[in-house]
Swiss-Prot record:
It is found in: Cytoplasm. SUPFAM superfamilies: Class II aaRS and biotin synthetases, Nucleic acid-binding proteins. Transmembrane segments: none annotated. The lineage of its organism: Bacteria, Bacillati, Bacillota, Bacilli, Lactobacillales. Homodimer. It is an enzyme of class 6 (ligase). The keyword Chaperone does not apply. Keywords: Aminoacyl-tRNA synthetase, ATP-binding, Cytoplasm, Ligase, Magnesium, Metal-binding, Nucleotide-binding, Protein biosynthesis. Its cofactor is Mg(2+). It comes from Streptococcus pneumoniae (strain CGSP14). InterPro entries: Aa-tRNA-synt_II, aa-tRNA-synth_II, aa-tRNA-synth_II/BPL/LPL, Lys-tRNA-ligase_II, Lys-tRNA-ligase_II_bac/euk, Lys-tRNA-ligase_II_N, Lys-tRNA-synth_II_C, NA-bd_OB-fold. NCBIfam families: lysS_bact, PRK00484.1. GO terms for cellular component: cytosol. This is Lysine--tRNA ligase.
Length: 496
């Protein structure tokens, strides 16, 4: 280590490095080796929950635990400390006469943040706290930096997001939130696996952005000297697998969109897309409700979910409403009536709904009305279906009214949680939709996509009637952990 670097260290860091050197002099590796424990903190608490101090003493049971040293007190020949593992904390009670002088020195010189292994007798203190009375201490790893001053509840938001490891050490609530996230994803997998779906993996690097209306990240493949994009959706590759006969597939994975950041948006996020052959959007509506209710039940139990003080009846059947009916109910405007684009624009002007340059069809105006007036009213789980063809380039037209598609979005607390439809499997219709998207792109719609001719070719080999679904995992995790910002459910959110 250079003198220059040593001068950058504070007193605590210097002392910790000196202790590291002292351990080496004693023949102890400061960064340890494999250590076998017999239980974690919670397993011990569960196992001995019903035994008092005397009963534990009579049982004379032993255990071996390991964890990070997070508290330490005592002096002379006796010390108390707490070790923290994945499940929580447990107290250790160390006596010099029980572990020996040399072993006691290891404990005595251990700093907060160090990892220790402890073998000993399971006991309960006079205060009733389950503890391990040490018979041997093993040094497992040296922490060369002290934990932050207020590590029992890190509060600096910048540090929480940039140094998530410190947040996880210090904030049990945060730690449990990410455990819950993991469980939600596991339960979604379990639900779909039990229904015969296959989990698959599709490329992250695409030649053409597609499957969603979003601006992509662009990168360059040096060996082939071609520009590529990070995927904005997994849709088109998953539907190729339906063409290939896989019938029921899903993928949980990262999606990348080169767009703004706010409380519910991060440039990279996790979604699940699900495709089922021989199904339509009504079947997928049932599937979506089942997935979300199963995930909610697994982490919140059978009842409703409380989100920021609002009771969300996630355990009850979700409301289902056509987009046009929802608009009519709130604004009085009836888009079931046939009208020209100019007539629709006039109604928009009257209602002060902004009209963009690329709004070339009545369907664009209908969607703008929905976003302006309806979205903010959708608190309880609501399936809004019947989106206009103009804003649904991959969805099948409704056979009874060709202006609209067999598509739905799920809204909860005014936010979209899922998007699904009966998939468009007519390659000729699909090509014309792609061409309309390409035209919108030329008119300034930077979320419109180009034409994926390879996907058109796949459809020409025949795709069965199919229902498809996309759910934003991060937003679902926010809902089920009562979190207001997406950064609190992403272990490593995007930072400047």
């Amino acid at each position: 280590m250079s003198t220059e670097h040593m001068e950058e260290l504070n007193d605590q860091q210097i002392v910790r490095r000196e202790k590291m050197a002292a351990l080496r002099e004693q023949g102890i590796d400061p960064f340890g080796k494999r250590f076998e424990r017999t239980a974690n903190s919670q397993e011990l608490k569960d196992k001995y929950a019903n035994l008092d101090k005397e009963q534990l003493h009579d049982k004379n049971e032993t255990a071996t635990i390991a964890g990070r040293l997070v508290t330490k007190r005592g002096k002379g020949k006796v010390g108390f400390a707490h070790l923290q593992d994945r499940e929580g904390q447990i107290q250790i009670y160390v006596r010099k006469d029980a572990v020996g002088e040399e072993n006691y020195e290891i404990f005595k010189k251990a700093d907060l943040g160090d990892f220790l292994g402890v073998e000993g007798e399971v006991m309960r203190t006079d205060m009733g706290e389950l503890s391990i009375k040490a018979t041997h201490i093993t040094h497992l790893s040296k922490a060369l930096r002290p934990l932050p001053e207020k590590f029992h509840g890190l509060t600096d938001v910048e540090t929480i997001y940039r140094k998530r490891y410190l947040d996880l050490i210090s904030n049990r609530e945060s730690f449990e939130r990410f455990v819950t996230r993991s469980k939600i994803i596991s339960e979604i997998r379990r639900y779909l696996d039990q229904k015969g779906f296959l989990e698959v993996e599709t490329p992250v690097l695409h030649n053409e952005a597609g499957g969603a209306a979003a601006r992509p990240f662009i990168t360059h493949h040096n060996a082939q000297n071609i520009d590529m994009v990070l995927r904005i959706a997994t849709e088109l590759h998953l539907k190729r697998l339906i063409v290939g006969g896989m019938e029921r597939v899903y993928e949980i994975g990262r999606i990348f969109r080169n767009e703004g950041m706010d409380a519910t948006h991060n440039p990279e996020f996790t979604s699940i897309e699900v495709y089922q052959a021989y199904a339509d959007f009504q079947d997928i509506m049932d599937l979506t409700e089942g997935i979300i209710q199963h995930a909610a039940k697994s982490v919140k139990g059978d009842g409703p979910v409380n989100y920021q003080g609002t009771e969300i009846k996630i355990n009850k059947p979700f409301k289902r409403v056509h987009m046009v009916d929802a608009i009519k109910e709130i604004t009085g405007v009836d888009f079931w009536q046939d009208m020209t684009l100019e007539e629709a624009k006039a109604i928009a002007a009257e209602k002060k709904v902004p009209v963009e340059k690329h709004y070339t069809e009545v369907g664009h105006i209908i969607n703008a009305f929905f976003e302006e007036f309806v979205e903010e009213t959708l608190i309880q789980p609501t399936f809004v279906y019947g989106h206009p063809v103009a804003v649904s380039p991959l969805a099948k037209k409704n056979p009874e009214d060709q202006r609209f598609t067999d598509r739905f979005e799920l809204f909860i607390m005014t936010k979209e949680y899922g998007n699904a439809f009966t998939e468009l499997n007519d390659p000729i219709d699909q090509l014309s939709r792609f061409e309309a998207q390409a035209k919108a792109k030329e008119l300034g719609d930077d979320e419109a996509t180009g034409i994926d001719y390879d996907y058109i070719e796949a459809l020409e080999y025949g795709m069965p009637p199919t229902g498809g679904l996309g759910i934003g995992i991060d937003r679902l995790c926010m809902l089920l952990t009562d979190t207001t910002t997406i950064r609190d459910v992403l272990l490593f959110p995007t930072m400047k």
